[in-house]
Amino acid sequence: MNTVKFIGMDVHKKTITIAIIDEGRQKQPRIYGSIANQLEALDKFCRKTVSTAARLHFVYEAGPCGYGIYRHLTQKGFDCMVAAPSMIPKKSGDRIKNDRRDAVMLARLHRAGELTAVYVPDAQDEAMRDLTRAREDAVVAARKSKQRLNAFLLRNSLTFAGRTKWSKAFFNWLSDIAMPYPAQQVALQEYIDTVHENLKRVNRLTDQIRQLVPAWRLAPVVSALQAARGVSLIVAVTVLAELGDLSRFDNPSQLMAHLGLVPSEHSSGENIKRG
């Protein structure tokens, strides 16, 4: 008889461990086993399982493997949830954890309706988010390379007499420095070159964002955000790429809660602590 099946998947880089449980509180889960973390292997499992099920409900935890499995399954017409790991109910006395138990737990909790789904971004939004995060990585790398160069200069008592660091005059001054030992000269030049390379990387990624934003579905919202004082193109794109579709928030309070900009309280007895 065809039944509704809930399928818990413990997803790793190379494998997916699968547990299946039928609807109905008396039904017990069973371990299907592990398959390769490849879409072809997942399709084969679906073809084999769907013949004995009225509906399949998949679930796996959000993690480093991303949303590829979710998008593939939903495009095939299956129901799939990506569960928030921080919201999964835990048993305090449970000291055993392995892939099979995790898959069974996900299947059980999904059947019971006790899991909370994470927001899965649109593929184009996620692509823009990858680009803005790549730029942020470049900004961090540039800042650290500047700090290392500054530390080298300070350690060797080299002080710039000009007013503004990282200006053309500053780099001209750097190029005129002659260190007493060849090894130090090589080190100085490497620090300088690294700063130049990282700054070029930041500029290159910034230009790419400017070129790609007009074709992005959220381009009108980017323009609207820029109407606010102090909000540049990069800030607007970064915020929207991280938040995704703003219509998923029913009201401003939900958006503020998502960002963590809500009051908190940790009080007990006479101790009152609000933040």
Specify the residue positions occupied by each region the protein language model found.
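A detector of single, family-specific signature residues
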Residues: 1-275
